[in-house]
């Protein structure tokens, strides 16, 4: 089966933005104008096509990135048909993982800003993520009909706060309630969209007289930006003072793809103005799969290889999202980088080193699907029937194995205990958690050995709220949720020698176990070491493992506050036994008693987990952020300058002091700072804190 759309007419783009910039509404308009949906779905009605989870329709925010395929011939039908694969992504800080994994598989992005609130904190986070993956992007300044909307101010913020060279290719005609349309700064014409047919038709008109001078000035800036693409263009521009429309477009396209400039458009998706012009700009300026560098990977001999966007190259794809569908089971969203994959054929998962079979391949339109016979280089689709694939795995041709660049996922930062409300919920909960963890790499599940509770960890409180909500709705599991917890540890600080003796002799067969142990502290992270120095058979060899086992059991239960003991070396150097009464159980108990007695004499200490915290904040709030970290017993490790005038603060802070930090940081910096944290080490807890914890658990 031949390719229906040539690869140079593909655009794989993401629509990314801050919460509430109007991103999902923009996507809805795109689907309406490209003919995919006949009725526009509004977010505030809970009817948006791409928000298909119940939680999203209730909360009015986008949680998972839905992939949608659509076609576009241009506002004026000026193009041959182009195929646009769009990924709509969430803008909430707890879901940055979704944005990250979408950007990883896209070739370009449309970043939506609100015309009145401009560059917001989450926009800074998203922008940095796009910088990390070098994604070419353009800007749509939306909500120009809103009170306080100001296109020039937003363009200025993009330049100063995000450090981008922003080049407007449109300017607005009026703003707020007076917003009428836009001026195309390349054609130098005004565009008015009809209000009778939801903006389906439009007309080109002359630029209003009062805006002519400003439009001429902005046109000049745009032509200069285009001329900088090459020496030839610059020479022509200096000689003639102008460039042709085609030359301008080709030059701006090249500079956008090279990440040198960011083009800006404006409009109001809700008022049906400007969205088709965004689609035209996507086709004109954002890259096709063949315009971006070929993806790199590692072959089975650990050599670096490339996979070009070519149907004739060996098949290679990246699984970038797993979703559970109520009708077909597990959907694995894949981005095909090279080659062709037919439904029903076999693939090799090079990360898991397993062969898999693809049952069916479907093209997703938010929540609906069309069956496909095959997918080719540049396609984004969902595969059904893959058994053991997780986000970030590479699927490839068995004869040409490759592992594509892995995605890096942040460590979860918050943990809560969940308990099923009834026995019936117990089994369902295990299945639900396993499925949810397969879908979301930033969500973890484990069992606490001390309390046997199920612990779930994620990227924030909203993240875990939604997980618990999904367990209830999708899997029918009712559960109780505990408070966030910290996991402490214990260790010793000095060396002791101690006797452990267990004797029971009351007529008949007794119990006798007798050991001498030396306990020594080890360096941080060294774990547990057991050494047998018994000579001359004072303890028979078959009882030695029982002593070790008894010590390890006592270590798990701790000696101060029932937390596990870390970093200890125990040497068994003497002891005695009884011909009749000694057995394994007696020596196990003797080992356990000896360790407990010795650890209490060896200057025991309570350890608390300390986190490596990195805060990104605008310079204005640096003093407040540092002061707050100091109040949380944080040690400031250093500070750096980030892109776009932000400061990076590196600190080490005890986990116990970090609960509620996301909320506090948001309010202290008006939501403009973001942070990440990961586990660093266990350190001695201060005496007053250790004392309170030990008393609360005794």
Curated annotation (Swiss-Prot):
Its main location: cytoplasm. Residues 8-290 form the tr-type G domain. One of its GO terms (biological process) is ribosome disassembly. This is Elongation factor G 1. Belongs to the TRAFAC class translation factor GTPase superfamily. Classic translation factor GTPase family. EF-G/EF-2 subfamily. Disulfide bonds: none annotated. It holds the Pfam family EFG_III. GTP binds at residues 17-24, 88-92, 142-145. GO terms for cellular component: cytoplasm. HAMAP family: EF_G_EF_2_B. It is found in: Cytoplasm. GO terms for molecular function: GTP binding; GTPase activity; guanosine tetraphosphate binding; translation elongation factor activity. Keywords: Cytoplasm, Elongation factor, GTP-binding, Nucleotide-binding, Protein biosynthesis. Gene3D superfamilies: 3.30.230.10, 3.30.70.240, Elongation Factor G (Translational Gtpase), domain 3, P-loop containing nucleotide triphosphate hydrolases, Translation factors. Catalyzes the GTP-dependent ribosomal translocation step during translation elongation. During this step, the ribosome changes from the pre-translocational (PRE) to the post-translocational (POST) state as the newly formed A-site-bound peptidyl-tRNA and P-site-bound deacylated tRNA move to the P and E sites, respectively. Catalyzes the coordinated movement of the two tRNA molecules, the mRNA and conformational changes in the ribosome.
């Amino acid at each position: 089966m031949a390719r229906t759309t040539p690869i140079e007419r593909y655009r794989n783009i993401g629509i990314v933005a801050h919460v509430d910039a109007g991103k999902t509404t923009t996507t809805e308009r795109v689907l309406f104008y490209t003919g995919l949906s006949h009725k526009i779905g509004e977010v505030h009605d809970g009817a948006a096509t791409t928000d298909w989870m119940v939680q999203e329709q209730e909360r009015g925010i986008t949680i998972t990135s839905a992939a949608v395929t659509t076609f576009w011939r241009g506002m004026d039908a000026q193009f041959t048909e182009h195929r646009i694969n769009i990924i709509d992504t969430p803008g909430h800080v707890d879901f940055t993982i979704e944005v990250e994994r979408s950007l990883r598989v896209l070739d370009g992005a449309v970043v939506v800003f609100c015309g009145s609130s401009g560059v917001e904190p989450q926009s800074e986070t998203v922008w940095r993520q796009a910088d990390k993956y070098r994604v070419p992007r353009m800007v749509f300044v939306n909500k120009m009909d809103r009170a306080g909307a100001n296109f020039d101010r937003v363009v200025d913020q993009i330049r100063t706060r995000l450090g981008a060279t922003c080049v407007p290719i449109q300017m607005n005609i009026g703003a707020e309630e007076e917003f009428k349309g836009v001026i195309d700064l390349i054609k130098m014409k005004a565009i008015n969209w009809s209000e009778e047919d939801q903006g389906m038709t439009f007309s080109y008109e002359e630029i209003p007289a009062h805006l002519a001078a400003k439009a001429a000035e902005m046109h000049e800036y745009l032509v200069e930006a285009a001329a900088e693409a090459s020496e030839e263009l610059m020479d022509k521009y200096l000689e003639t003072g102008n460039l042709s429309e085609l030359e301008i477009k080709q030059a701006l396209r090249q500079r956008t793809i090279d990440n040198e400039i960011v083009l800006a458009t404006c409009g109001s998706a809700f008022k049906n103005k400007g969205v088709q012009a965004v689609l035209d700009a996507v086709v004109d300026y954002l890259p096709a799969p063949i315009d971006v560098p070929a993806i790199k990977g590692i072959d089975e001999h650990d050599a670096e290889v490339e996979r070009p966007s070519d149907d004739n190259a060996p098949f290679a794809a990246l699984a970038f999202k797993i979703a559970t569908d109520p009708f077909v089971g597990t959907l694995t969203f894949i981005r095909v980088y090279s080659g062709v994959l037919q439904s029903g054929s076999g693939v090799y998962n090079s990360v898991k080193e397993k062969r898999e079979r693809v049952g069916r391949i479907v093209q997703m339109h938010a929540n609906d699907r069309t069956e496909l016979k095959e997918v080719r280089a540049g396609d984004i689709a969902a595969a059904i029937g893959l058994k053991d694939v997780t986000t970030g795995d590479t699927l490839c041709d068995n004869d040409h194995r490759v592992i594509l660049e892995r995605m890096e996922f942040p460590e979860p930062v918050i943990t809560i205990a969940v308990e099923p409300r009834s026995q019936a919920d117990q089994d369902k909960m295990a299945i639900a958690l396993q499925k949810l963890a397969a879908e979301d790499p930033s969500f973890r599940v484990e069992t606490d050995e001390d309390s046997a509770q199920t612990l779930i960890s994620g990227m924030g409180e909203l993240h875990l709220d939604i997980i618990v909500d999904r367990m209830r709705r999708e899997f029918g599991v009712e559960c109780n949720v505990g408070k966030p917890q910290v996991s402490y540890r214990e260790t010793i600080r000095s060396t002791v020698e101690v006797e452990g003796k267990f004797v029971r002799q009351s007529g008949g067969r007794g119990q006798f176990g007798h050991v001498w142990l030396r306990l020594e502290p080890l360096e941080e992270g060294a774990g547990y070491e057991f050494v047998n120095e018994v000579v001359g058979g004072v303890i028979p060899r078959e009882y030695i493992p029982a002593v070790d086992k008894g010590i390890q059991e006592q270590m798990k239960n701790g000696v101060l506050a029932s937390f596990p003991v870390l970093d200890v070396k125990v040497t068994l150097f003497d002891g005695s036994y009884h011909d009749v009464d000694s057995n394994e159980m007696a020596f196990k108990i003797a080992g356990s008693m000896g360790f407990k007695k010795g650890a209490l004499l060896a200057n025991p200490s309570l350890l608390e987990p300390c986190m490596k915290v990195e805060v990104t904040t605008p310079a204005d709030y640096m003093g407040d952020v540092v002061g707050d970290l100091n109040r949380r017993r944080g040690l400031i490790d250093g500070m750096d300058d980030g892109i776009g005038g932000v400061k990076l603060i590196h600190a080490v802070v005890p986990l116990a002091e970090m609960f509620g930090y996301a909320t506090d940081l948001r309010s202290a910096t008006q939501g403009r700072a973001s942070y990440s944290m990961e586990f660093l080490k266990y350190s001695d807890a201060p005496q007053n804190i250790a004392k309170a914890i030990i008393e609360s658990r005794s």
